[in-house]
Amino acid sequence: MTRAFNFSAGPATLPESVLRQAQAEMLDWHGSGASIVEMSHRGAEFMSVAAEAEADLRRLLDIPDDYAVLFLSGGATTQQALIPLNFAAPGQRADYVVSGHWGKTAVKQAGVYVDVNIAASSEANGYRELPARADWQLSRDAAYVHITANETIHGVEFRDVPDTGNVPLIADFSSSIASEPLDVRRYGVIYAGAQKNLGPVGVAVMIIRRDLLERSGQPRADIFDYRSHVARDSMLNTPPTWNWYLAGLVFKWMLAEGGVTEFAKRNAAKAALVYGAIDGSGGFYRNEVAYAARSRMNIPFFLPDAELDARFVAEAKAAGLLALKGHKVVGGIRASLYNAMPLAGAEALVAFMADFQQRHG
């Protein structure tokens, strides 16, 4: 069997070696006579899987001990709703910087519970660049400042950590976590849906500075309270064990491959290839994002018209290049180059782009 190159924005491609290991262990995990899917989350077998996954993630991202790590059901959108509940008191304001679709979604979720101040937004220019830090209008008494580190739809990425002073910085890292070294201490909270760089859909990773857990936040049930999840080691309720297990395999794979420093090099090389093909096409392919804000993970681009966009997607699929259709919000084409996408995938895409332009340009 020849695997295609899957450029999906998420659920995204996973390392083949991880999939094969999961396949081999599916019916009999480590000689136990049962699948990990069937095991109790409170049994010794899965407890060891959970502990190893957390230890490996801490090693991978160099997470200090004064930060708690959670593996929770659901994805980043769920956390967008829970963050204001946990970290902003009733009547307290929270600052949001909107650099794309998912930042705007975070504002909508938070607005149900807190007074949201949109400190800055690049919506007026179509999210083609990041809001300039000098233009941010931060509140004096904000509970926190929220950013989306990488916008998958519009293809913009924060390459530097914004300085928010004594106000905790909370960041949605769903689509760029573990893609390069990360200074965790610059953030109060980091959260990420796993389905792009960390594993399959269905589990979210939270990295929370422990002192922030002392905030009273809003009245909420235990299941919505991060303190309760920390106290129970992410097992307040039955967790998504299969997803957690697979994420753990991905962590081990990343560590064995050289860790985030190595993936930063690989991701830069892949992105340079694709952007080079776009910029060198004489306008046949267009990326409209300001150069300094270009995402390494998600590269949107457009052909001269929608008919060519559709033809590109169809012919690419026939050539073994999958999921290149752009998000419905913006259209066009989108190539997602997460950690598990090999350099050969970017090379195959660039070769196809050149061939397609020669035939249709």
From Swiss-Prot:
The record's keywords, sorted A to Z, are:
Amino-acid biosynthesis, Aminotransferase, Cytoplasm, Pyridoxal phosphate, Pyridoxine biosynthesis, Serine biosynthesis, Transferase
List the GO biological process terms: L-serine biosynthetic process; pyridoxine biosynthetic process
Protein name (Swiss-Prot/TrEMBL): Phosphoserine aminotransferase
**Pfam families per UniProt:** Aminotran_5
Entry annotated with the keyword Chloroplast: no
Cofactor(s) required, per the database record = pyridoxal 5'-phosphate
User: Which EC main class describes this enzyme?
Assistant: transferase
Gene3D superfamilies recorded? Aspartate Aminotransferase, domain 1 (3.90.1150.10), Type I PLP-dependent aspartate aminotransferase-like (Major domain) (3.40.640.10)
**Which pathway is it part of?**
Amino-acid biosynthesis; L-serine biosynthesis; L-serine from 3-phospho-D-glycerate: step 2/3; Cofactor biosynthesis; pyridoxine 5'-phosphate biosynthesis; pyridoxine 5'-phosphate from D-erythrose 4-phosphate: step 3/5
Organism from which the protein derives: Stenotrophomonas maltophilia (strain K279a)
Q: What does this protein do?
A: Catalyzes the reversible conversion of 3-phosphohydroxypyruvate to phosphoserine and of 3-hydroxy-2-oxo-4-phosphonooxybutanoate to phosphohydroxythreonine.
CC terms in the record's Gene Ontology section: cytoplasm
A molecular function (GO) term: O-phospho-L-serine:2-oxoglutarate aminotransferase activity
